[in-house]
Amino acid sequence: MTNRDIVWHEASITKEEYQQKNKHKSSILWLTGLSGSGKSTIANAAARELFEQGYQVIVLDGDNIRHGLNKDLGFSDDDRKENIRRIGEVAKLFVQQGTIVITAFISPFREDRDQVRELVAEGEFNEIYVKCDLDICEKRDPKGLYKKARNGEIPFFTGIDSPYEEPKAPELVLDSGKCEREECTGRLVDFVKNSLA
């Protein structure tokens, strides 16, 4: 069997029907930024708040995805690209089911984030840059990863010996180095209410 033999199966419930029932649009909120910038913390806090207000929402977190779906991938540039490609495809499926998908991935390469944007309709991908200076992320270092990277124990670590390409025109910037978690979370929730309601 080849890819030509595989046919896309149309669902019996359309994205528009899901959105009508959910009373909100579906979208990917792609949180990107350095390790320790607060992506997962903000994503989960916003998801909780949105869920309590009746939104259909799911968080796809980089560490959690690497425990299952992407556990076969390392951290080379090619593996990072494949990691983002796979999660982009998963996020697209949730968007088709009327869900707001909040992702929390370093996703260091602009090209990879742009490829995910191309998977969904215009306006269904929102790049959220969780901005935080490297020195602040290193001071936070909640998982001890920066220390290990500085000691040479973790190769290809973003921000240390592998580059991070900042978004050029994100839909929203959350400066977690200057704002408290609650303020960043509130701004993300407000963004959803203003653009997806």
From Swiss-Prot:
Substrates-to-products reaction catalysed: adenosine 5'-phosphosulfate + ATP = 3'-phosphoadenylyl sulfate + ADP + H(+)
Catalytic residues of the enzyme: 107 (phosphoserine intermediate)
Domain of life from the UniProt record: Bacteria
Residues the entry annotates as binding ATP: 33-40
Any one GO biological process: sulfate assimilation
Pathways per UniProt: Sulfur metabolism; hydrogen sulfide biosynthesis; sulfite from sulfate: step 2/3
InterPro entries in UniProt: APS_kinase, P-loop_NTPase
EC category name: transferase
Organism whose genome encodes this protein: Bacillus velezensis (strain DSM 23117 / BGSC 10A6 / LMG 26770 / FZB42)
UniProt record similarity statement: Belongs to the APS kinase family.
UniProt-listed Enzyme Commission number(s): 2.7.1.25
A Pfam family that the UniProt record links to this protein: APS_kinase
UniProt keyword annotation of Cell wall biogenesis/degradation present: no
PANTHER family with a match to the protein in the record: BIFUNCTIONAL 3'-PHOSPHOADENOSINE 5'-PHOSPHOSULFATE SYNTHASE, PAPS SYNTHETASE, ISOFORM D
Record key words, sorted: ATP-binding, Kinase, Nucleotide-binding, Phosphoprotein, Transferase
Protein name (database record): Adenylyl-sulfate kinase
One GO MF term: ATP binding
Record's function text: Catalyzes the synthesis of activated sulfate.
Keyword Transport: no
